[in-house]
Amino acid sequence: MMFRLTSVGSFLLVIVFLNLVVLTNACDLEGMFCMYDFECCLSECCMGICAFGCTKRAQRQKLLRSFGQR
């Protein structure tokens, strides 16, 4: 009976550990590289970087700066 409880407990511990690994790799923090919005935690993918509050206007401003206009 003791062997059965130990093996069940070990099995459950492995399941919990695997769930924690998946949850910690679920999303990227602000400032990390991304390709899609779902990769970012509480932010969106803005020009390849997770950013909070990225708008099309900010993207337009960066584009104008790259062409030397203000």
Swiss-Prot record:
What are the protein's UniProt keywords? Cleavage on pair of basic residues, Disulfide bond, Secreted, Signal, Toxin
Where does the record locate the signal sequence feature? 1-26
Q: List the disulfide bonds.
A: C27-C41, C34-C46, C40-C50, C45-C54
> Where is it made, tissue-wise?
Expressed by the venom duct.
**Gene Ontology cellular component terms for the protein in this record:** extracellular region
Its localization reads: Secreted
User: Which PROSITE patterns does the protein's record reference?
Assistant: I_CONOTOXIN
Q: Which domain of life is it from?
A: Eukaryota
List, alphabetically, the InterPro entries matched.
Conotoxin-I_CS (IPR013141), Conotoxin_I2 (IPR020242)
Q: Name one GO molecular function term.
A: toxin activity
Q: Which residues form the propeptide?
A: 58-70
Domain comment from the record reads as follows: The cysteine framework is XI (C-C-CC-CC-C-C).
Protein family per UniProt: Belongs to the conotoxin I2 superfamily.
What is the protein name given in its UniProt record? Conotoxin Lt11.6
